[in-house]
Amino acid sequence: MGKVIGIDLGTTNSCVAVMEGTQPKVIENAEGARTTPSIVAFTDEGERLVGQPAKRQAVTNPSRTFFAIKRLIGRTYDDPMTQKDKGLVPYHIVRAGNGDAWVEADGKQFSPSQISAFTLQKMKETAESYLGQPVTQAVITVPAYFNDAQRQATKDAGKIAGLEVLRIINEPTAAALAYGLDKKKSGVIAVYDLGGGTFDVSILEIGDGVFEVKSTNGDTFLGGEDFDNRIVEYLAAEFKREQGIDLTRDKLALQRLKEAAEKAKIELSSATQTEINLPYITADASGPKHLALKLSRAKFESLVDDLIQRTIEPCRKALKDAGVAASEIDEVVLVGGMTRMPKIQDVVKTFFGKEPHKGVNPDEVVAIGAAVQAGVLQGDVKDVLLLDVTPLSLGIETLGGVFTRLIDRNTTIPTKKSQVFSTAEDNQNAVTIRVFQGEREMAADNKLLGQFDLVGIPPAPRGVPQIEVTFDIDANGIVNVTAKDKATGKEHQIRIQASGGLSDTEIQRMVQEAEANAAEDKKRRELVEVKNQGESLVHATEKSVKEYGDKVSESDRAGISTAIDALRQALAGEDVETIKARTTDLMQASMKLGEAMYAAQAGGGEAASAGAEDPQAKKDDVIDADFQEVDDKDHKKRA
């Protein structure tokens, strides 16, 4: 069995870790960073960029650069949060055939699961490069407050990326695992997790290797992106006030504002003031316009105060559901990049009445916890038991549109619960089971997860047939529902697939596309590598001709010149094999030059002339000299 990796698929950044013996290790990506921006872009040439390369070109390619895609995963196009997001991002959000929110670039539509899969592929490749072996299995984290559709969509993303997702684990729970792994502590901890796009709070009880989640709460549309947007709105408003130009209508300017906002936000965690300078942000008839202003920490805090306060109510609810007071919390663990903001730390300290624990890296702790869970599933980590909960109540719609709960929120999972219902009308031969998730009393106000029909019920007066509805939630928090007519034994079971969501056929198509893209990416990479190699050889050869050209014959110089021209011509094209062949030709042609060069270095100008007359003899001389040098070194070592 290969290694199982742990992946934190974040809104802003993603991170991958693996267990090495009993210790988790965060793996650096190809760029040498421990986290990877969750950004995917498509260039003019159709090339796909993931991570830092995608982020670098975002300003010049805003409509084809997808960021914060996690906010759309598992959401419908008509969802109020999707509509809110539409006004905040420069790329196109479109309605898919199934009613889900998808994104579009150059006329091609992508599901959020597919875009997330590209980031997961990058994480997979990062792990494979480090481990030196293929990786096919992973534990992936999601916000604790993700509903069933969002969890299923995350699992689909893993599948598209070529990963078997062994477990979907809640981010605060993963953080608690990482926090508590080496500690022999026991007690009640609160995990306050404010990331790039989502907020979660979980109350856990830890003791003797058992991590039991008592309650969880949160907001799946509250995070660093919202803090960035407040700065963007402020900058745009100030610029409009001074210059009379609305920058929000210009996608290029908007992307520059977004980058500047993120940078300013980060700087204000350590500095009390930052300067934002964006020259040539736009232009009008009078000429180019520049944006330059100072932003103080106090001003930033006033811009986002309501966002920070929005995290307090979920904390209050989580404590109430867990049946503990703030004073009974032994430790508050901060997770997510936003918790570096001093004001957030102050608010958390005030609410819980204690200094929050800052001993974990907020950007890496979730991936580390995922790796620990991967180690548990693989059998490498012993004596750790994780008991998580379902974040939202589950139930069905009953007469009058009422939401009848079968499983209450914060129930430990996996769990199974049954309840008997009956028909609403005489001689009713079929019932429609509509499954909802949420906390509102009327079904329509909650999230519809899916529906199915149980048919073939024998005619009977209303209230007589007995229909047993069973909810089964697995350890990933994904729901199965069964309806059974107790009189006939007739049964209908579904794994909840939202009215939207990806079908197996669509997932399979996306898997194949991902594989095809991987092959295409490999070809592109090979082309870039052989071109780089060819260009380096041309440069080195031309330099050598200038220095040592007089040491070789006229015909050799002509041969080298012809080979350089042929390689240059090949480099202008896209044919890998032709470039390789012309590179080899130039290497062969320039061998005489190389011999002359070594001869000149080893024996001076006279020897080099001899080398030009008798290259083979000189080659031998060079080799002898080479061995002589080594012998000298050895002799020195012995002495």
From Swiss-Prot:
Give the matching SUPFAM superfamilies: Actin-like ATPase domain, Heat shock protein 70kD (HSP70), C-terminal subdomain, Heat shock protein 70kD (HSP70), peptide-binding domain
Keyword set, alphabetical order: ATP-binding, Chaperone, Nucleotide-binding, Phosphoprotein, Stress response
Q: Which residues carry this modification: Phosphothreonine?
A: T198
Return the Basic and acidic residues bias intervals: 630-639
A GO molecular-function descriptor: ATP-dependent protein folding chaperone
Kindly list any coiled-coil regions of this protein: none
Name what induces it: By stress conditions e.g. heat shock.
- Domain of life of the organism in this record? Bacteria
Spell out the disulfide connections: none
Record bears the keyword Phosphoprotein:
yes
The keyword tRNA-binding is annotated on this UniProt entry: no
Residue spans of biased composition, Low complexity class: 601-613
The record ties this protein, via InterPro entries, to: ATPase_NBD, Chaperone_DnaK, Heat_shock_70_CS, HSP70_C_sf, HSP70_peptide-bd_sf, Hsp_70_fam
Residue span of region Disordered: 601-639
Q: What does this protein do?
A: Acts as a chaperone.
- Similarity comment: family membership: Belongs to the heat shock protein 70 family.
Protein name per the record? Chaperone protein DnaK
Gene name for this UniProt entry: dnaK
